[in-house]
């Protein structure tokens, strides 16, 4: 399963502030760890397996490791004004147990991006739990980054979605606006996301009985119909407008 979000940092944000970005990410890590303890420990990615286990990202909850910060400062030395990416993985070699996070920032005029990929043991269940549990992960990403959208879908769904220039619905799509069943009657569930008691957005869910599968024609058809419905109402953003 792949989670993708795009967001913008404030214009006042300092470049090369690795500690801030890693601290900011922590609520997402904590939510993932609560779903699957194999998602509790993360390491900076390296050029080989041995190197990729050298640098834990965190020394303690919400505390980026001294080693990780030093590696990132050295990696991007002299590149303060250039875009940067922090790549990390959970140290698990087997695909079904593996996971990775990519966080892009200092991107200037274009959006920052967040990508989480979680390997699954099979196509009929999710390591993260049922749709409500997965929606909690999406909601945490939403409250952490205030993104323009979040998608949660199998990676291969990209070839099945209706529009190439807009996010797809897949299993779940978060949009930072109130969405009701009147907007998308095809949705199987709508989950409001709130911060400080105020709704900031909605998670649109296309399947609730089992995890979304691109091999299930009904799942793909429902997601596609939701995409068309959103575009008809000008509710689905174009990538170029984010």
Question: In which residue ranges do the predicted regions lie?
Answer:
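C-terminal interaction module
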Residues: 1-47, 155-242
């Amino acid at each position: 399963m792949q989670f993708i979000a795009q967001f913008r940092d404030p214009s006042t944000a300092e470049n090369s502030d690795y500690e801030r970005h890693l601290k900011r990410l922590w609520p997402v890590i904590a939510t993932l760890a609560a779903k699957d303890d194999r998602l509790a420990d993360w390491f900076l990615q390296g050029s080989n397996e041995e190197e990729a286990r050298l640098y834990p990202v965190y020394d303690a909850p919400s505390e980026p490791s001294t080693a990780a910060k030093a590696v990132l400062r050295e990696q991007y030395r002299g590149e303060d004004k250039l875009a940067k990416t922090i790549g990390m993985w959970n140290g698990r070699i087997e695909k079904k147990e593996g996971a990775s996070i990519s966080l892009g920032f200092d991107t200037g005029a274009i959006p920052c991006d967040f990508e989480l990929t979680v390997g699954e043991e099979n196509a009929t269940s999710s390591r993260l739990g049922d749709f409500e549990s997965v929606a909690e992960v999406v909601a945490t990403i939403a409250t952490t980054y205030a993104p323009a959208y979040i998608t949660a879908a199998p990676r291969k769904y990209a070839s099945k979605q209706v529009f190439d220039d807009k996010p797809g619905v897949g299993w779940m799509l978060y949009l930072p606006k109130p969405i009701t069943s009147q907007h998308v009657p095809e949705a199987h569930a709508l989950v409001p996301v709130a911060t400080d008691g105020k709704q900031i957005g909605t998670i649109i869910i296309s399947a609730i009985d089992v995890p979304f599968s691109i091999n299930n024609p009904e799942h793909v058809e429902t997601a596609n119909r939701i995409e068309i419905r959103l575009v008809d109402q000008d509710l689905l953003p174009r990538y170029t407008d984010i």
